[in-house]
């Protein structure tokens, strides 16, 4: 039998193929884990570990429309492809190698497609996904450089792989549904408990006059009060926007939401030593130019999240709402700075950061600070608990008595 990538006399090549497959598996497992952690967190104390900047971050991918297919995370298909490469290296055969070589082509095409989608549509790049891209392209190179010349795949193996892949996909789909259901049940109850365990904090000395929901003239008079420190170019803030947009409708007349500008850009924010989102300051100035137009501008920015990263789009936005002067208006700049600087009023919650408000989004819900975003189910559970508790909501240990199961009723 002729020497090839995984067959006789090619121990070194088999090792590299095994390494590529193992890398594909590792990157896929981490990607799947991040997908579920981002979309179905099980704690209020959750944080992303690979969001370095507006471009290099994983949350954009985790929240994207193609992050999963009917509940099956995209990373599962990479996991399965990597597993086949590893098995083909450990148990080599001509049929296995030909089939893997055939599949490597489609995997490489998929990788290129995902890379283009990520960079040019999402305008970001997931580091975990990038690891998979690198190992996949290495595997593709090895198969097409050293693989058997006769590359027609084994139909039998393809059929077996298809059945196994569908079986695994079904398992992930069921797991996805279980995680989704749990968000309204036991996980939500745990989050409510964690929420009440948080120490109370005061409201900022200056509450932004820019609100996305108003139930009363005085901020303190609504039963549900949310102050959100937000950056318009933060992927997690986009996720939060979608959750609050739905909840603001459901709790209309009972909720006040104040938008506390906190762009993570050194151009206008000196509270945190982060310069992650170029353009966030300009977007904040445009939105703060006219309180009467704030809500419309706020919604348009988030509804065009990817376009908002473009300087040209921001110029068009300012022109559309007559806010061209905002970028150089001293009064608007002073107002924005006054709002941003309230982030420095809170005691630090970590030795790593100087202040409590250090990232976006940061929420203050009825005088308790939550760092990071929360999904709809968790926010709804907290809101229901606050409404059911009334003035006693501030007492520790009340979450169990105030608990409301928010799961949709099954017919």
Show the residue positions of the predicted features.
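Membrane-interfacial helix-loop segments of redox and metal-homeostasis proteins
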Residues: 2-177
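Soluble or luminal CAZymes and related metallo-dependent hydrolases
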Residues: 10, 278, 282, 331-339
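Local sequence-structure signature of Cys/Sec-based thiol-disulfide redox active-site neighborhoods
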Residues: 23, 119, 216-246, 359
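Post-signal/leader-peptide non-cytosolic segments of secretory proteins
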Residues: 69, 199-211, 399-404, 408
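Membrane-interface segments at or immediately adjacent to transmembrane helices
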Residues: 175-221, 227
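Structural alpha/beta surface segment adjacent to cysteine/selenocysteine redox centers
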Residues: 227-232, 238-319, 353-355, 394-410
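C-terminal cap of thioredoxin/glutaredoxin-like
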Residues: 242-248, 315-411
């Amino acid at each position: 039998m002729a020497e090839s990538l995984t067959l006789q006399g090619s121990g070194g090549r088999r090792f590299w193929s095994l390494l590529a497959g193992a890398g594909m598996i590792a990157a896929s497992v981490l990607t799947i884990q991040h997908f579920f952690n981002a979309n179905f967190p099980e704690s209020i104390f959750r944080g992303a570990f690979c969001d370095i900047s507006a471009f290099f971050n994983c949350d954009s991918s985790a929240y994207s429309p193609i992050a999963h297919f009917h509940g099956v995370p995209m990373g599962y298909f990479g996991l399965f492809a990597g597993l086949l490469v590893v098995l083909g290296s450990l148990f080599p055969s001509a049929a296995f190698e030909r089939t893997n070589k055939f599949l490597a082509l489609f995997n490489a095409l998929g990788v290129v497609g995902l890379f283009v989608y990520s960079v040019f549509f999402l305008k970001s790049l997931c580091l975990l996904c990038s690891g998979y891209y690198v190992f996949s392209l290495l595997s593709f190179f090895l198969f097409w450089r050293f693989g058997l010349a006769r590359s027609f795949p084994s139909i039998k193996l393809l059929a077996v792989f298809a059945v196994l892949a569908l079986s695994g996909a079904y398992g992930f789909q069921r797991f996805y549904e279980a995680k989704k259901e749990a968000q309204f049940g036991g996980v939500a109850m745990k989050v409510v408990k964690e929420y009440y365990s948080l120490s109370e904090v005061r409201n900022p000395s200056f509450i932004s006059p820019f609100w996305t929901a108003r139930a009363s003239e005085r901020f303190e008079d609504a039963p549900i009060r949310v102050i959100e420190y937000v950056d318009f170019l933060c992927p997690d803030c986009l996720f939060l926007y979608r959750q609050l947009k739905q909840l603001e409708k459901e709790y209309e007349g009972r909720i006040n939401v104040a938008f506390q500008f906190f762009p993570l850009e050194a151009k206008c924010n000196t509270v945190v030593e982060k310069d992650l989102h170029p353009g966030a300051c300009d977007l904040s100035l445009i939105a703060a130019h006219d309180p009467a137009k704030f809500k419309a501008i706020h919604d348009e920015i988030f509804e065009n999240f990817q376009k908002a990263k473009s300087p040209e789009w921001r110029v068009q936005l300012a022109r559309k709402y007559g806010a061209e002067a905002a970028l150089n208006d001293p009064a608007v700049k002073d107002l924005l700075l006054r709002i941003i600087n309230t982030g420095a009023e809170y005691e630090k919650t970590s030795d790593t950061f100087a202040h409590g408000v250090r990232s976006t989004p940061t929420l203050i819900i009825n005088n308790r600070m939550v760092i990071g975003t929360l999904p709809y189910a968790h926010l709804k559970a907290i809101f229901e608990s606050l409404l059911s508790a009334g003035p006693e909501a501030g007492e520790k240990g009340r979450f169990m008595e105030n608990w409301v199961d928010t799961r949709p009723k099954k017919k």
